[in-house]
């Protein structure tokens, strides 16, 4: 079973602030954003200046997968996510349904998942791993990396006050399912 990896100070506080501002300015209020389970989700594939920063982050995580897990992976999908008061995410796996493992999942090619925390001026919102009785208190610039399957069933505790911002990213071992050519 692969471990959950956590690295503090993965990116600078200035980079965290840049991504938060981008998310705030490009959320579901315009064509770049969407809403998923009441959370404003922002993509950034066509914004060159923010793409430079996110590519740098993705490449660092891809290199971490190689070093930590001896796996070559490719970017599958990534987004910036706003979590307001009352928002949470029930426990789940990122590549199969935990209540019905035989049911085809809509993202079966996700092999590794990462969450990059962009702020900590909120209460609640911890990421928890039910298989390990382990939770991560978000701190700006900290990243967690873990395999996407049944070994790492996880969720997010309810945000009790403030606003939580994260960058969620998934990686695949199958180059044919890569977001980038």
Over which residues does each language-model region extend?
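Fe(II)/2-oxoglutarate oxygenase catalytic core
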Residues: 1-143, 151-181
